[in-house]
UniProtKB/Swiss-Prot annotation:
It is a peripheral membrane protein. Coiled coil: none annotated. InterPro entries: NdhM. One of its GO terms (molecular function) is quinone binding. HAMAP family: NDH1_NDH1M. This is NAD(P)H-quinone oxidoreductase subunit M.
Length: 115
């Protein structure tokens, strides 16, 4: 019997025990795949994307040798959400004004008028 697909879905991060092939998810219990900001709520520079990918790799590597569970995936997802919030507050990413819905899920934008 194969292991079931594990996944974690937060507001801005989706993590799956799978690999991508031709834009399809293929179950693979030996790999984790992250989908960053699937709703395009933020504007991302390549450097910011790389920072999140590197943080994801660090969090995954810290779990090597541990049993992979829903809890572990949720913890990684929550840690990445916090990391994105820090990046938003530092101005490394910004809200996408062309997003389908502007709900400011991580707080109002920090602008001189609001400070």
């Amino acid at each position: 019997m194969t292991d079931p697909l594990l996944k974690c879905t937060t507001r801005h991060i989706r993590i799956f025990t799978a690999i991508t092939q031709n834009n399809n998810l293929i179950e693979d219990s030996d790999h984790l795949t992250m989908d960053l900001d699937p709703d395009n709520e933020f504007l991302w520079e390549n450097q910011a994307i790389e920072k999140v990918q590197n943080r994801f790799s660090e969090l995954v590597e810290s779990q090597v040798g541990q049993e992979l569970s829903d809890y572990v995936l949720r913890k990684i997802g929550s840690d990445l959400e916090s990391y994105i919030r820090q990046m938003l507050q530092a101005g490394e990413v910004s809200y996408n004004p062309d997003s389908r819905v502007l709900n400011y899920s991580m707080g109002l934008p920090r602008t001189p008028e609001l400070l």
